[in-house]
Structure formats: C-alpha cells, structure tokens
C-alpha cells in the first residue's frame, strides 16, 4: 500500500472517541416480537455496530415496556401475576433479539427499582417546577371489574354509521372520531358490563406551559429529519396558537405500574415511566460496570443521546420526553430518528395470509437471520418512508447479492491459494489498483452507515463486488491453474480477490456480523474495524481452509414460513374460542352477582327481509383517484366512477391496509344510496365495502371487495 493510500483511509476516521448512548423503542411485554418490530432493532443495531467500528464508546440500551392495563388483564386471563408474565415475555424477547444479532449492551425491564426511583425523581422535579397540575376528570368505569376503562377498552355502536363493536374513540368503518360517551350501547371489553361514569382526580404534566412551548420550539430545529421537524411544527402551531395540551400522566388503581409519590391509589401512566426506562436500563449497566451515569445524563453532558423509534410514537419522543428531561434537570436527546412501517408483499401484515411473521417462526423454519438483516438494510434510508418485504425479491436479492456476488469471490480463489501457495497471499498484490479502489471506498461506505443511508452503503458495496467478479472472470484463475508457467499471475489473481473479499466483508460487517466473524476466522485476523482498511492481508499469516459462509434461500423455506404463521393463527383462533366461552361464563356469573345482565354481542342481529335488503343500492364503482387525508391516521379519500355524470367523493377508513396508489384503477362495491355525510375533511357521498375479521386483534386486516373484471362502473349488485 502506498503512503497516500494509508493517509486517505486514516483521514476519514473520526478524530477522537465519542460517547454515544443509543436506544430503540421498548417492546411491549404483551406479545411476541415480529418482523415489523425487527425493522427498528436491526436498523439501530447496524448503526451502533458501525459506530463501534470507529472505536467510539457506544452503549446500546433496551428494555421491555412492562406496565399498563393490558398486561394486568392478560396476566389475570392466564392465571399469572403480572410479574410472572413479564418475566416470561422478557426471556422470549431476549431470545429473539439474540437470534437476530441485536447487540444490546443491556436489555432490561421497566419494572425495576432503578426505573421507579428515576420516575419518581423526574416527577417530583416537575412538580417542584410547577409543571404538575391536579384535575378532576370523568371517565368510564366498569362496575363488574371495579376499574376505570381506557377508551380502547370500551366498545359499542358507532353514533354516526351505527356499525357495531367499534372502539370508544373512533369508528374503523366510517372513520368518525367521537367521545366514549357518544357510543351507543357501550360495553366493557373486559367484562361485558355497561360502563358507568365516575369522576377521579388525575395528575397532568403542563405541556401547555409557555416554558415548555418555548423550549420545544427551539429544540425542534435540531431534528435531523425534515418530516419530523414539520410534524412537530404542526403540533406546536404558530406562535400564540397554544396548540399543546396538558398530558394526563396518571391512572387509577387497579393498575400494574408505579404508584405516584404522595398520591395513594394513583399510578404513573405507562408512557411516563416507559421512556424513563431508557435511563433506568443504562443506570443498571453503569452500576455493574463502573460507568459514571450522571456524567452521561446531566445538562451539558458531552455524551450524545439518540433514540430510534417508529413514526407512530414521534409525538411522545419529540414533545413529552424532551420537555420532561429539560425541566427535571437532565440533558435532552441529541436526536430522534423515526422510521416507517413494514408491509409484506405490498400489504399490511396478515395472520390469515401467513405474513404476520414472528421472529421465532423465522428462526424455527431455518432461515438465516442475516438474510433478513441484509434485506432490511438494503431498503432502509434516513427518511420515514415505509418499507416493503417482497418475499420473491427477498429470495432473489439474497441469492444474487450475497451468494452470487459476495461469498462467490472467496469460494473461487481460496482453494487455489491453499493448494498452490500454502494459503499465503502475494504481498505485492496488495497494491493492485482494484484493491486500492475498494480501500478508498471504505470511508464513504462508513459515512453512509452513520448517515443511516444503509441502502446507499449496500448499493456501493455490491457495485464494488461486481467489479471484483468482473476482474476474476477476466483473469480466469481456473485456466491459469492449468499451466505452471502462470503461477505468478494465478497467485496475484487469488491474492487480489481475497483482499478485495476482506474489504467487502469489512463494508458488510455492520449488517452481517456473524458472517464477518467467520471471515475473520478464515483469514486468521482480529475483529475488523474501519481503520483496518489500511491493514491488508499478509503472507506472514496463511488463510485457513474455506468453509461455506452462506446458502441460498429456497422457495420451500418461504412457503414453510408462511404456513407456520397461518398455523399459528388457527391455534390462536382455537384458543380464542375456548377463552371466549370461558369469558362469557365469567361475564354471566359476574353480571348475576351484580344484578345486571352483561351485553352479548350480536344479540339484536335479527334477520331482515328481502324487502329490507332491496332498499340498499349496491353499485360497482371504479376508483379513479385516491389520496391520504391530511390530519387523519385512518382515512383515504376515494374518487369513484359510479357510471354517473359526475364522480363521487368517499372517505374510507382503510388507510392502515392500503397505499393510495394500490387502489387507483381497481373496481369495488359501494353503497350508493347512503345519505351524504359532512365530515371535517369534506362531504362523503357513500361507503365502499370492506371485509374484516370479527376479532381484528386476533386476525388484523381490512380487504376492500373487488368484483370480477367484467363488471362495469354503475352496475347494480343484487
């Protein structure tokens, strides 16, 4: 290697070691890790590994989010204490993260002494600052279970479209939002009883305080993602608008969580102590390893603090969390990085299609975790864009990039080097122009990782792999090996190929750490860091016998994975049926004991006559345009051709299942004679029909009805 080569590589390395604390959002301890979760943990882990390869002091912290009503109720249903449930789920989550190479320095639990102490300390500091308010509020109360009910634990009939079994805050059929008090025939999803209204004292974090607003307006300017900045400014509004609302941080007993100091029977809402769990997990690590915790979290700390999250929880991490930290005497996050959602084959993950894929089913089916790490990395960038796991593309990309391009290089050269040259490279070959080009590219690839542009880093890497393969194809070592007179040329070809392979492995190490470890063992070298681009292979260290590093993805493995997850749906359904029967018995006996009958779903679904059905005008409609509704998380605006002179405008609550571009040009079925309804987004002139499971938690998914292609807009369905 020339002196100039060495200088260029070293100049790209960061000057001085940084202290960096990194977190991913905490998984809720109420279910399994699935591939949608893994997008975030893999994204964070790649970033952390890339920074560690610079020699920085980096700590990647995680924990299970363990508090709240859902965990309390699930534990009761399973005959466990909440502690027993969260301990079991922690073991399952830790197993899954280990399987996918997620390299937490500490994976802990929010149900810890450290978290209790820190949550109380932050709360008391906010109280001292005059940022905690007490107010009486009215809530729904379950008289059978003797507990207050969150909105999502109340169901009933939508007051607008009269769809049954809708949640207490919004209708998933027509997209309306409303108060739980407006629901018709409401019932508790916990017991089936009719809720009553009760008042209770609650505690609020005064986010509307001018101090909070002023701080957040300044803090938002430092966010790395323009989408996040724009969203925060939308929430903040213009100066003087006072759009920020105070945040209810308390819940009433019974509740699984931490009791609020000086407020018996009142508990911290899970979203207060969950982010504090980042610090609690780090404090636990610090105490075990002699790290100065306070030096990392005090105001003005030189340490950096980053949070990777899904875009759905941006509100908590860019409003409440930084404000809580600022006014409780802590440093604030350096930045928050939000990612998009995962779809599978262009649609929301579905248990019925087998695409609601759990981490454990992926491992049990025998698929390589580093295949998925590579595929996700190839799709990820620094924006909040959603990413799609296309299973055909997954198979093709892994087989082409990783097997056909990358590991193929080593397999083509290693045998010749061991057999003909005792496994020792030709030192002069380390200055070959191709090797120099790869070496010069390493700083650019490392910079792409730090910028969270993983797709760019991998495209660059695979372009270089193409050049290496073209070099091997041109040199034809298999032909050179036939004539002893070509020994020098053969030695050079194999040496260049293997040094290039080492550099490609360095470039891929943040994404595929296990393959990188196998490559390090193959070459007999220390763990690779970015600075090692300048340390080529040497004839002083012979390589070891080549072992296969990766196999191809087989279509049968994909089929088995989908089948395994469809089977799990059937098992869940059987369990839900049994559980539902038991719950019905319990609700009946509880209701009897309280002299109040429980509501039974569907009891009023009396048969209708053919005349009743004839009143509904169902028409074929063509979706000629579709767009997301700004300000709504659920609605799409459809422009429909119904065979009339003018198109119709319809709002539909199917945003969770479809991207707008997926629907344009499709035929569907609409209720054409439904009275137009004025919504805050505009006038809705009908309703499109969509199917969903009765229990959408057990089987999520919405599916619009699509007639055969021979149908035409305006045709009547009868």
Swiss-Prot record:
Biological process terms in GO annotation: methionyl-tRNA aminoacylation
UniProt short sequence motif 'HIGH' region, positions renumbered to this chain: 27-37
GO molecular function terms listed in the Swiss-Prot or TrEMBL record: ATP binding; metal ion binding; methionine-tRNA ligase activity; tRNA binding
Domain tRNA-binding as annotated: residue spans: 612-718
Binding site residues for ATP: 351
GO cellular component term of the entry, any: cytosol
Primary residence: cytoplasm
Cofactor, how bound (note): Binds 1 zinc ion per subunit.
Domain of life: Bacteria
SUPFAM superfamilies: Anticodon-binding domain of a subclass of class I aminoacyl-tRNA synthetases (SSF47323), Methionyl-tRNA synthetase (MetRS), Zn-domain (SSF57770), Nucleic acid-binding proteins (SSF50249), Nucleotidylyl transferase (SSF52374)
Enzyme Commission designation: 6.1.1.10
Alphabetized PROSITE patterns for the sequence: AA_TRNA_LIGASE_I, TRBD
Cofactor(s) it depends on: Zn(2+)
Catalytic EC class: ligase
HAMAP family: Met_tRNA_synth_type1
Oligomeric and partner information: Homodimer.
UniProt family annotation: Belongs to the class-I aminoacyl-tRNA synthetase family. MetG type 1 subfamily.
Function summary: Is required not only for elongation of protein synthesis but also for the initiation of all mRNA translation through initiator tRNA(fMet) aminoacylation.
Name under which the protein is recorded: Methionine--tRNA ligase
Taxonomic lineage: Bacteria, Pseudomonadati, Pseudomonadota, Betaproteobacteria, Burkholderiales
The gene coding this protein: metG
